Design a protein with these regions (language model features):
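AlphaC helix of the eukaryotic protein kinase fold
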Residues: 40-55
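Conserved short submotifs of the Hanks-type protein kinase catalytic core
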Residues: 71-85
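Protein kinase catalytic-loop region centered on the HRD/HxD motif
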Residues: 108-118
Length: 400
């Protein structure tokens, strides 16, 4: 892309959603976000980000200016706050002072995002602009941001989950039976900090399913074990951000910012950071009710035991879960999801609806609607095997 109404553009990011910096004689500098020609989902992201323009502040975000088309591509024009994408500054560990000079305003910018009532849902270095001259940090990439305080991510094939898997919180994968909220952004912030401090991501994997497994079940190597000169308290801050459950993480970006400022003060004053209690100023202004299931340990244990028996001995088992509407049957059953999908299993579900009593197979159809996408995005040899088995079962039923 070379010109747009007198602008000359240089590339900052390639991909389905590309980012360009535009400048020209006498023209106001801009950023241009362009969607791929055959990327309907990407177009929707640009439209969504533009719709948020009144809620994004120039103090912490690159604000949308216009939504237009250029050479057959949907483009979003942003104000250019200056700065360099943070992913261009990665690749080697950062010293403590340099890290804190980036991390503190970054946590502060995220604090403003959350105070505005938004969840970014795609925090990563490529969506962060860092101005080395002023120290300012601004976010881009609000294409999947949510105005909801808390929302559920449905289980989807890894290739279609909105966001970036390398930076994605466990609950955002849709496989934890937990909601996405502002603390999901804090996990992604922790991944970004980890990469800044060590020069590497906390998890790498050969395929998306394995990467999801890492986020859900594996503990990363603490940063101070990879960078021996790193003060332990900084490493502990990052590890707290990377906790598997929301309740164990920092609850607010303000709490992270306060602890980082304490680290900077100690580092500049004494050249070291002694251990201190984390999160002393980490108080949320919202009541976040924990999503842990209480009083259902027996029912969950029964389901897990049935699953274990089938895995060990083969065959099939039927477990019926009954109860009044709204009592929590789905929540109990969904606790199996993580256990099944981590070893590359397939989890599908259907729910009986009183309004569909005249459609006896609607629940099975609902379950199979979840099965087909998982097969298409799974191992290629699964498809003919499942097809053959399904044909045999259908033939048996038809003969009855």
């Amino acid at each position: 892309m070379n010109e747009l109404s007198g602008y000359v553009f240089s590339s900052l990011r390639e991909g389905d959603i590309a980012l360009y910096r535009g400048s020209g004689n006498g023209l106001t500098p801009i950023l241009l976000v362009a969607a791929g020609e055959t990327s309907p989902g990407c177009v929707e992201r640009l439209e969504h980000e533009y719709a948020l323009k009144s809620e994004l502040d120039a103090d912490w975000a690159a604000r949308p200016v216009a939504l237009t088309h250029d050479n057959g591509r949907m483009t979003l024009v942003l104000e250019d706050p200056g700065g360099t994408p943070l992913d261009r500054l990665l690749g080697r560990p950062r010293d403590v002072s340099h890290f804190l000079r980036i991390a503190i305003p970054l946590a502060g910018a995220l604090r403003h995002v959350h105070q505005r009532g938004l969840i970014h849902k795609d925090i990563k270095p490529a969506n962060i602009l860092v101005n080395g001259a002023t120290g300012a940090v601004k976010f881009t990439g609000f294409g999947i941001a949510s105005r909801l305080a808390r929302e559920r991510q449905a289980p989807e094939p890894p290739e279609t989950v909105a966001g970036t898997l390398a930076y994605m919180a466990p609950e955002q994968t849709g496989r934890m039976n937990r909601s996405v909220d502002s603390r999901s952004d804090l996990y992604a912030l922790g991944v970004t900090f980890y990469e800044l401090l060590t020069g590497a991501l906390p998890f790498t994997a050969a395929d998306p399913i394995e990467l999801i497994h890492c986020h859900i079940a594996r503990e990363p190597v603490p940063p101070h074990e990879l960078a021996s000169a790193l003060p332990a308290p900084l490493s502990m801050i990052v590890m707290k951000l990377l906790a598997k459950t929301c309740e164990e993480r920092y609850q607010t970006a303000a709490g992270v910012e306060a602890d980082l400022r304490r680290c900077l003060t100690a580092w500049e004053s004494f050249g070291r950071i002694d251990p201190f209690p984390l999160g002393l100023q980490d108080a949320s202004d919202r009541l976040m009710i924990p999503e842990k299931l209480y009083g259902r340990e027996g029912e969950i244990a029964t389901l897990l035991a049935a699953f274990d028996r089938v895995v060990k001995h083969g065959g099939s088992e039927l477990v019926l879960v009954s109860g009044y509407s709204g009592i929590g049957k789905s929540s109990v059953v969904n606790e199996l999801h993580k256990v099944i999908v981590l070893p590359r299993g397939i989890f599908i579900s259907g729910k009986f609806d009183l309004r569909l009593r005249d459609s006896p197979h609607s629940t099975l159809a609902q379950a199979f609607q979840g099965l087909i996408p998982q097969l298409l995005n799974g191992q290629t040899d699964d498809i003919p095997r499942c097809e053959t088995r399904s044909r045999k079962l259908l033939a048996i039923r038809a003969a009855c």
